């Protein structure tokens, strides 16, 4: 940890095809072993598939899916006097996006379709319709936070 100054977060380059920062971040999260071109191919194929299936513009469906998966609150463990409490805390905007993208990718990897592009397209279309595993994950996190509302005063 630097002692002199706080180092700012690096700005990632926008997506070359659509010019979207969110899509560039999504490609980076999907990427495995540094294979960015493969990840881009998967995402672009998934977006094309989404356009064919839904008839809407792919970027708007992608953003709607992200919006439906973004968590507003989450729980963090906090140790107080020998016992651990799950304390509900609000999620910062950058983390909201990161969690939503991570959950979409995880849910897509668990699906049964043949190619990753088809799985990703299916999961994003489901998320845009407020269905699917990623949306269920968000609702589980919200439910946990709601159940532990009594410990909200332990926030730090």
Curated annotation (Swiss-Prot):
Part of the 30S ribosomal subunit. Contacts proteins S9 and S11. PANTHER family: RIBOSOMAL PROTEIN S7. The keyword RNA-binding applies. GO terms for biological process: translation. It holds the Pfam family Ribosomal_S7. One of the primary rRNA binding proteins, it binds directly to 16S rRNA where it nucleates assembly of the head domain of the 30S subunit. Is located at the subunit interface close to the decoding center, probably blocks exit of the E-site tRNA. InterPro entries: Ribosomal_uS7 (IPR000235), Ribosomal_uS7_bac/org-type (IPR005717), Ribosomal_uS7_CS (IPR020606), Ribosomal_uS7_dom (IPR023798), Ribosomal_uS7_dom_sf (IPR036823). It comes from Photobacterium profundum (strain SS9). The keyword RNA-binding applies. GO terms for molecular function: rRNA binding; structural constituent of ribosome; tRNA binding. Disulfide bonds: none annotated. This is Small ribosomal subunit protein uS7. Keywords: Ribonucleoprotein, Ribosomal protein, RNA-binding, rRNA-binding, tRNA-binding. It comes from the Bacteria. Coiled coil: none annotated. Belongs to the universal ribosomal protein uS7 family. GO terms for cellular component: small ribosomal subunit.
């Amino acid at each position: 940890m630097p002692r002199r100054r706080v180092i700012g977060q690096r700005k990632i380059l926008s997506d070359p095809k659509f010019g979207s920062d969110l899509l560039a971040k999504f490609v980076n999260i999907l990427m495995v072993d540094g294979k960015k071109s493969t990840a881009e191919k998967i995402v672009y194929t998934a977006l094309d598939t989404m356009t064919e299936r839904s008839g809407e513009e792919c970027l708007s469906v992608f953003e709607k899916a992200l919006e439906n998966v973004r968590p507003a609150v989450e729980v963090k463990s906090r140790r107080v006097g020998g016992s651990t409490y799950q304390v509900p805390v609000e999620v910062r905007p950058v983390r909201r996006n990161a969690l939503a993208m991570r959950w979409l990718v995880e849910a897509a990897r668990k699906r049964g379709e043949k190619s990753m592009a088809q799985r990703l397209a299916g999961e994003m279309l489901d998320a845009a319709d407020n269905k699917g595993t990623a949306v269920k994950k968000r609702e589980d996190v919200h439910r946990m936070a709601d159940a532990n509302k009594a410990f909200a005063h332990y926030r730090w």
